[in-house]
Design a protein with these regions (language model features):
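Flexible acidic/glycine-rich loop/turn elements at helix↔coil and beta-strand↔loop transitions
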Residues: 50-56
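Short linear motifs at secondary-structure transitions and domain/linker junctions
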Residues: 34-44, 71-73, 117-120, 139-145
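Conserved AMP-binding/adenylate-forming core of the ANL superfamily
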Residues: 36-46, 57-110, 127-132
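Short, charged, surface-exposed hinge/linker loops at domain edges
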Residues: 12-37
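Intrinsically disordered, low-complexity boundary segments flanking structured domains
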Residues: 47-50, 154
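Structural core segment of the AMP-binding/adenylate-forming
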Residues: 1-20, 86-87, 114-160
Length: 160
C-alpha cells in the first residue's frame, strides 16, 4: 500500500469511527445479509427533509449559474406536490422521471415523495422506444420529462 492509500485509510478511519459525523455501523437486513450504514444519518426522507428545512436561506443546490436555497427547494417542491395532487396523483401512485440530472429532477423527486407517491426514475440515456417500454410496464400515472426525453413520445397513450 502506497503512502497516499495509507493516508486515505487513516483519514477514513478517523471520520467513520464511533461518535463521528460519518460513523459507520453494521446492521442485518430482512434477508439476513450484513450491511453497513451511516449511524448518524436520518433513517427516512421525512427526517432528512425536516433537518434540511432548518437551513432556510443556506445554499441547497448550485447548478451552473443557478442557486437554490433550502427554502427555495422546499417551496418549488411543494408546488410540484400540489400540482400532482391537483392532477389526481395519490399516495402510493407511481410517477416517473426521465430527464437529465438538473434541479428540476430534484424538485420533481421531492414533490413526488413529499405527497407519498412512488418515484420511478427512468434512465435518461434511453431512446423513445425504451422509455415507452418502461412506461408500459411500471404503471406510472404521470411522467416528468425534459424536451430531449419527451421527443418521440408525442403519440404515447398508455392505458390499463
Amino acid at each position: 500500500m502506497n503512502d497516499s492509500n495509507k493516508l486515505f485509510e487513516q483519514i477514513s478511519n478517523e471520520f467513520t469511527q464511533k461518535g463521528q459525523l460519518f460513523e459507520i455501523r453494521e446492521y442485518t437486513d430482512s434477508f439476513g445479509l450484513k450491511n453497513k450504514e451511516f449511524a448518524t444519518f436520518s433513517d427516512s426522507l421525512r427526517k432528512y427533509f425536516d433537518f434540511a428545512a432548518m437551513h432556510g436561506d443556506k445554499d441547497f443546490l448550485v447548478f451552473e449559474d443557478e442557486r437554490y436555497s433550502f427554502a427555495d427547494a422546499f417551496k418549488i417542491s411543494a408546488k410540484v406536490g400540489n400540482a400532482l395532487v391537483d392532477a389526481g396523483i395519490q399516495k402510493g401512485d407511481r410517477v416517473s422521471i426521465c430527464m437529465q440530472n438538473n434541479p428540476e429532477f430534484i424538485f420533481a423527486y421531492m414533490g413526488i415523495v413529499g405527497i407519498g407517491a412512488v418515484c420511478v426514475p427512468l434512465n435518461s440515456w434511453w431512446v423513445a422506444d425504451e422509455i415507452t417500454y418502461a412506461l408500459e410496464h411500471c404503471d406510472a400515472k404521470l411522467m416528468f420529462g425534459d424536451q430531449r426525453r419527451l421527443k418521440g413520445l408525442d403519440d404515447l397513450k398508455i392505458t390499463k
